[in-house]
Structures are given as C-alpha cells and as structure tokens.
Amino acid sequence: MQQPQHLREHYRHFQPITTRWHDNDLYGHVNNVTYYSYFDTAVNSYLIETGGLDIHHGEIVGFVVSSSCDYFESIAFPERIEVGLRIGKLGNSSVQYELAVFRKGELQACAAGRFVHVFVDRQSNQPVSIPQPLRQACLLYTSPSPRDRQK
C-alpha cells in the first residue's frame, strides 16, 4: 500500500517542539500516544496565540471528539521536531485540524494525523458557534484542495 505524501509545503503553520526524555518508550522511540500530545500542543498553542482562546476563564472550550495518527518513521529523544498544522474542515461548531510531525527542517513527515474539536459552552457542555476570533484564526490556515496543491 502506497502512503499518501505529507510534505512540509502542504502545511501552513509550524509549532516547534523538543522531544523529552519520558517521550521514549521501551523500544527507544517516541511512544505512539505521545504524538497526540504534540498535536494537542500545536493546536492549542495556535488557538491561544492567534485566536485568543482563553483556556482558563473563557466561556467556550474545545473538546476533542475524534483523532487519528499514521506513523511513517520513528522519532526519539533528543530530537527537535515541528508539528505542521492546517485546517481541513471548518464547520459551525467544529474544526478538523490536519497535522504532521517533521524532524526540524525535513520535507517529509514522520507521522500525520487529524484532530477534531467541537467548541462547547463551558457551563452547559453544549455545542456553540465558533467565535469570530477563533474562526478567523482557522481561516488563515484552511488547506487548499489536493487539486489546488498540484498547481
């Protein structure tokens, strides 16, 4: 089965991360569950810095309702990586992020995944429309269609 290409040029924003000692598992590479932590860090850092998300006192919060990851190459401590981020789908109350983990400066991803947030009212836990500042932040990195990428 041929893997789809996940190239650096297909991602619009990058979050630098340094792997940590405890990221490695018994097999000497970053454990698969740790990639989800990297995704969470990249998405939430972006939303806080660019969209004004207030994770401590804001009226809305983002709940992860779906996530997945495909692994192509191992990474290990100590490495500097960059998590590429683009927005795959922007709905009324949900966002699908498309993410990829790259070794610093490399063009081909070591892993790629998706992460879906539904934004909810902090008190009621009911879905709400994405506030305009967050929506604008997401629109900045909405991914082009595969056909547009080939142009």
Say what each PLM segment does.
Residues 117-119, 135-136:
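A short acidic/small-residue loop/turn micro-motif
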Residues 1-49:
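Catalytic strand-loop segment that frames the active site of acyl-thioester-processing enzymes
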Residues 141-146, 150:
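Conserved small/polar residues in nucleotide/adenosyl-binding loops
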Residues 46-95, 110-113:
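Hydrophobic beta-strand-centered segment that forms part of the acyl-chain substrate-binding groove
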Residues 25, 103-104, 121-122:
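Short, acidic, Ser/Thr-enriched surface-loop or helix-capping motifs
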